[in-house]
């Protein structure tokens, strides 16, 4: 059984984690991290469990096709309240009319529903492809993110998730870019994110760039991109299941100080053949970074025929709560 750690134990075992991890990844030099520095955080870590609506992917998609089937976002929010989540990450895909924005009447109704439940929106997110060689594809993604920044502002959501990876029909960023160099593609992605971040600054919404296992599949790649964007309204969404390295915990530790949102997954590479995530270790890393805010979990089918959102989500939430309690500084 896990037991709470003392303040001395916690500081001894975790305060040096990001530095040690970063050094192992070859990024902590004498000058430290020179760009994309995280914002100042005071008051110690405070972690609030949230749920990414994508955990109900199949049921939400079924409802979109037939309102008599599955569940909608309102029911997802009810589920969050019933199980004691503090927030909900309402992915844009599941709003009516996506990729277009829903009308204000819908947003107001959903926002009031969430308020009545005592919840908050921890974020939203859209699809975009900034690795595409076609500038029209990149421009389309910029406009979509800008539109959903305004949606987020209306809902009171602090972040909009953006991808730095390719999207279908492309199989990877190399195909999407037409064989362009990594540096060229990073420049495309950074330029698009800078424009999005400028728009986010006007509305008080942060563009949260998620690692998704393609163009961004390591912590150093994630940090390199943020350094190139170099905008205070662009930061990291750390997906614990999409750093495709030998030691994903090192990547997570490197990026934790730059995180404004999370996707805590069940396994380290979002497959049932990869190791189960050590939530106590993840939470220790998050605490060491001083992060204060929402920690959304996301469960996925991952090929399981018996996957049931209503079973897996409470199970993972209980494990996250146990990890939070076990790492509480006493």
Region annotations inferred by a language model:
Residues 152-175, 203-212:
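Active-site groove signature of glycoside hydrolases
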Residues 87, 159, 261, 293-294:
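Residues at the N-termini of beta-strands
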Residues 280, 287, 293-298:
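H/E-rich (His + Asp/Glu) clusters that bind or coordinate divalent metals
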Residues 2-159, 180-187, 231, 235, ...:
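N-terminal pre-domain/capping segments
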Residues 119, 205, 289-293:
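A short helix->loop->beta-strand "cap" motif at the edges of active sites that frequently abuts
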Residues 186, 190-284:
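Acidic/histidine-rich catalytic cores of soluble enzymes
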Residues 92-106, 129-133, 168-172, 212-219, ...:
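Acidic-and-aromatic substrate-binding clefts and catalytic sites of carbohydrate-active enzymes
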């Amino acid at each position: 059984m896990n037991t709470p750690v003392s303040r001395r134990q916690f500081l001894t075992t975790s305060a040096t984690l990001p530095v040690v991890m970063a050094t192992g990844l070859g990024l902590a030099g004498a000058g430290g991290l020179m760009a994309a520095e995280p914002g100042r955080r005071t008051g110690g870590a405070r972690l609030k469990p949230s749920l990414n609506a994508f955990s109900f992917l199949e049921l939400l998609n079924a409802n979109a096709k037939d309102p008599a089937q599955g569940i909608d976002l309102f029911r997802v929010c009810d589920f969050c309240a019933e199980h004691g989540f503090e927030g909900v990450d309402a992915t844009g895909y599941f709003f009516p009319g996506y990729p277009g924005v829903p009308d204000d009447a819908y947003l107001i109704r959903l926002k009031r529903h969430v308020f009545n439940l005592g919840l908050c929106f921890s974020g939203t997110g859209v699809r975009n492809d900034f690795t595409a060689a076609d500038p029209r594809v990149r421009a389309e993604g910029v406009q979509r993110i800008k539109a959903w920044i305004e949606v987020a502002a209306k809902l009171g959501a602090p972040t909009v998730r953006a991808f730095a990876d390719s999207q279908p029909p492309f199989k990877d960023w190399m195909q999407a870019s037409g064989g362009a160099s990594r540096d060229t593609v990073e420049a495309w992605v950074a330029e698009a994110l800078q424009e999005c971040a400028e728009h986010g600054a006007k509305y008080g919404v942060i563009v949260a760039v998620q690692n998704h296992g393609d163009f961004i599949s390591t912590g150093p790649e994630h940090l390199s991109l943020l350094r190139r964007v170099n905008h205070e309204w662009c930061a990291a969404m750390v997906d614990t299941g999409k750093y495709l390295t030998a030691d994903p915990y090192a990547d997570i530790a490197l990026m934790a100080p730059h995180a404004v949102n999370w996707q805590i997954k069940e396994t380290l590479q979002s497959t049932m053949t990869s190791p189960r995530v050590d939530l106590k270790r993840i939470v220790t890393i998050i605490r060491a970074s001083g992060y204060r805010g929402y920690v959304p979990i996301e469960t996925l089918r991952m090929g399981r025929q018996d996957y049931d959102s209503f079973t897996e989500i409470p199970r993972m939430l209980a494990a996250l709560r146990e990890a939070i309690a076990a790492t509480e500084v006493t």
